[in-house]
Amino acid sequence: MQWEPVIGLEIHAQLATKSKIFSGAATAYGAPPNTQACAVDLGLPGVLPVLNQAVVRMAVKFGLAIEAKIAKHSVFARKNYFYPDLPKGYQISQYELPIVADGHVIIELEDGVEKRIEIVRAHLEEDAGKSLHEDFHGMTGIDLNRAGTPLLEIVSGPDLRSTKEAVTYMKKIHTLVRYLGICDGNMQEGSFRCDANISIRPQGQETLGTRTELKNINSFRFVERALQYEIERQTEVLESGGQVLQETRLFDPAKNETRPMRTKEEATDYRYFPDPDLLPLVLEDSFIDEVRETLPELPDAKRKRFVMEYALSAYDASVLTASRELADYYEAVVKTADGEAKLSANWVMGDLAGALNKEGKSIADSPVSPEQLGQLIKRIADETISGKIAKTVFETMYAQGGKADEIIARQGLKQVTDTASIEKLIDEVLAANPQQVTQYQGGKDKLFGFFVGQVMKTSKGKANPQQLNELLKKKLS
């Protein structure tokens, strides 16, 4: 029997605010334990939460970007459960009336086919604290710095049908929240993580199978591995006549397996009710319009524009718009390079990306500015230097800094374009290799490349390749 996986993701994006969702405590990552938790975060008697307006703006911004309905009236609720790192005994979230509903994104599959993924809702909530196990023996430490950190939980429909689709969708949301500037997307720090709901059913059947939830997966690779393991596990259970249990499971990357955590709860288990300390959130049209004005050019629109405006391939445009920082860098290079779009794309995706990857750096950390790279590309385009020499200039620029023109002048790298000078170089090479000249004129055409190489070697790579080819052909004819 052929089985079909049915997958939905609940992505938790930590919103990039300086203070928490209901208190003024800081949200900076890496502070010593329990130094960024105030009385509100600790749930001490007599304190009242106050909603951070920046959080609301970010949620609305996301909703507009996915063409969703923005609720003008939404409500915060208490989600009641006991856990050591939840000091109040409840989590403030949104349940029946979320701030964002009925949106969608379009993902592109490997075969180029586009697929629409529904986003059922996106709601605001506070994060819990963190349990620490590594530095303790026989006990668990609690760090409440993260308690009260604002989260946007983004819930997809059960629209994903493979591990690849799930990862593609997750990357799409990751790119989007970073473009919008509402989340830094740092998965190592837990700023962007997901829970995955997965069931399998016979191919062609509409009824959903029993689902399991995989908790707190914080890398694209782990999402793919966890889902693949769970598909295989559920398939084995059903084909052996067993029954899949509705439960919450944890993915163990070291063992590459999922293991049970607890029986999956239903919403009723959390006893949701409106938080009496928080008024309903009411948004005016003017507020939503104000947020709409701050929307940047979104990834899909930017990618299409790059194809049309810069005549790039769909692949190149996709790579260059993978992050807002990279797209901005590329456009600044093109501007400096007087519109040399394709050549700029080749250098940004090739030599620059290679150098950055080698050192584990991002485009934001590039020691070569877009203006420096753009000037170098101008010198290739106007044939001041050859592409080969440009690599030498780039290496110097990357390691030591400096402008392309200064490096070219200092190292004497300007391309030889004077016809007489190139002819002199050719004559020297031909005179030094009479046997090869005779063989070439006798029909051994492959020796042409040998002569080109010898002239380039003699000129230290500075002879203009096009002129060299033309003059050499005349000399050998």
UniProtKB/Swiss-Prot annotation:
Q: Which reaction does it catalyse?
A: L-glutamyl-tRNA(Gln) + L-glutamine + ATP + H2O = L-glutaminyl-tRNA(Gln) + L-glutamate + ADP + phosphate + H(+); L-aspartyl-tRNA(Asn) + L-glutamine + ATP + H2O = L-asparaginyl-tRNA(Asn) + L-glutamate + ADP + phosphate + 2 H(+)
GO-annotated molecular function: asparaginyl-tRNA synthase (glutamine-hydrolyzing) activity; ATP binding; glutaminyl-tRNA synthase (glutamine-hydrolyzing) activity
Q: Which Gene3D superfamilies match?
A: 1.10.10.410, GatB domain, N-terminal subdomain
| Enzyme Commission number, as recorded | 6.3.5.-
> Can you tell which superkingdom this protein's organism belongs to?
Bacteria
Q: Which InterPro entries match?
A: Asn/Gln-tRNA_amidoTrfase_suB/E (IPR017959), Asn/Gln-tRNA_Trfase_suB/E_cat (IPR006075), Asn/Gln_amidotransferase (IPR018027), Asn/Gln_tRNA_amidoTrase-B-like (IPR003789), GatB (IPR004413), GatB_C_1 (IPR042114), GatB_Yqey_C_2 (IPR023168), Gln-tRNA_amidoTrfase_suB_CS (IPR017958)
PANTHER family reported for this sequence: GLUTAMYL-TRNA GLN AMIDOTRANSFERASE SUBUNIT B MITOCHONDRIAL AND PROKARYOTIC PET112-RELATED (PTHR11659), GLUTAMYL-TRNA(GLN) AMIDOTRANSFERASE SUBUNIT B, MITOCHONDRIAL (PTHR11659:SF0)
Role description: Allows the formation of correctly charged Asn-tRNA(Asn) or Gln-tRNA(Gln) through the transamidation of misacylated Asp-tRNA(Asn) or Glu-tRNA(Gln) in organisms which lack either or both of asparaginyl-tRNA or glutaminyl-tRNA synthetases. The reaction takes place in the presence of glutamine and ATP through an activated phospho-Asp-tRNA(Asn) or phospho-Glu-tRNA(Gln).
Give the protein name, as stated in the record: Aspartyl/glutamyl-tRNA(Asn/Gln) amidotransferase subunit B
Gene name of this polypeptide: gatB
